[in-house]
Amino acid sequence: MKKSYLYLMACAMGAMSLTSCSEDSTPAGGGGDSTIEVTLAQVSKPKPNPWLAQEEYSITHFNSAQTDAFSYEVKDGTFNIDLSKCQMTWSGPVNLMTLASTSPKYMWGMSSDRVSYLDISDGKLERVAEAGLPGITMKTQEQLTNMTADYATYDELSKTITDILGPAPQMSMANGNYVLCDKDNYAYTNAGQVMVRYRLANPNNPKEGIVLDHQIRLTDFTFNSFTLVGATMTYDGHLVVAAQNGILVLNRALTTIEDSYALPSDQILTNSICIDENGGLYVASNSRTPGGKGLMQKLICKDGKFSTSPADGAWQAYYDGGPKAPCIKLGYGTGSTPTLMGFGQDEDKLVVITDGSKRMKLVAFWRDEIPSGAQQVAGYDKRIAGVHEVTCGLPASTEWIQSEQSVVVGGYDAFVVNNINVTDQEINDKIIGVIAIGPIVKGPQGTECVRWNTKENKWESKWARSDVSSVSMIPAVSTKSEMVFVCGWNDASGWEVTGLDWKSGATRHRTILGKSNRANGAYAIIQYLANGDLLFNSVAGPIRVKY
């Protein structure tokens, strides 16, 4: 999504807002297809990774396939929430995800300034232990409160944030950006180019604290990268770490770099990676030049070694890039972490991203052997199974429709959001920008759900909502409730988590959180707990919202 991390740090963050819709809002319908309709609870799921703590929530984007799908039920209805009555903890300014641990009673809170161990049993959300990241100063509750206070102007907000975080607040995003918890309850995160794993001092008594178990500085091994951008765990128990200019594989103990792979010199990586149960590692990099082609690759990672040989199943395929986009979109290629689609006995096995075009396209690649009967899409690599220009129901005159979010996948359906809006406000820092979105700076609108037609091997639009927008949080879908959730700003009522029906796009759920910026999700992912409570990973720390 970005040209380089230095460029990312210098570029502006775009503004977005959500105009929430009433429950009887009707989406624009798409064409039908011949794919058999089944409930999301019935569709094939990614194979559980035996090296992760749980099947769901133990890695960013919820599973190794990065589908952003969870199995818990969420209520229909409209809920007005008083945040002052909610249980919350303090950390930030980015709390990307709260990870499932090996115990259903506890979760790991993963932040840009610390790691926490949270007791979620019996309806609680209580921090029982915490530890700072190497070289990072933990923010105080007072500082985080000031960051989320009400401000009349962008300049006023900017001054406060820089006073707290320094002259380049978005540098904090280089920490804790992709995280996971393994089967032995080690939590992995990063502080810049240092990869770290944590454990409990006493697994039988979490209140005794968190120990930094091991760390490894990767600066000399990342091919001159500025920062790390992703991490995953292979199905045979090796840690794969993505940097801007290459990929590394390490042992879980973080004592050995087992292998490395350098990206082509014209490519840069700023999104994370996903992996399948057979060692297929999917990497979507971007061109370093405007309009240049991005590169989707499948590497093979087995026994701690990379292979780029087609004989082992590896492949490469170029996809469309684009010009420099307005903020929030940065760089010239995809803003998506690759997402797998099709599992088990499903007919088609795909990996999907959005491309870098001004009006983005949803691109599906055959991730294994290309079917013998597959027709090549005109003008594209034969590895590309299908291409769909996303409209989000917006007028044909809309210049930019682009996304910084991963594609949400359930069955053969894919959900995307538009993150681009041209604004007169100059925004030169992503953290300042994301805190300004909604309350101070107006943002874009538009979501769309698209289906892969397995009979005709093509994308078809199911529905679109031009009146709904996701601000910066990663959307997520409940397979049991068949709702996809976004978070955005409503000028009348403030921050809101909105649930849209997966089949029709109609609004079914509204959690109205109010106008306090404590309810700003700042790049985090939307999560729900087993009992249906919202686990809201806000800019100042996780909040448990009960219904």
Segments (PLM) and residue ranges:
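Surface-exposed loop and turn segments in beta-propeller and other repeat-based domains
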Residues: S71-C86, A129-A168, V211-N224, P264-S265, ...
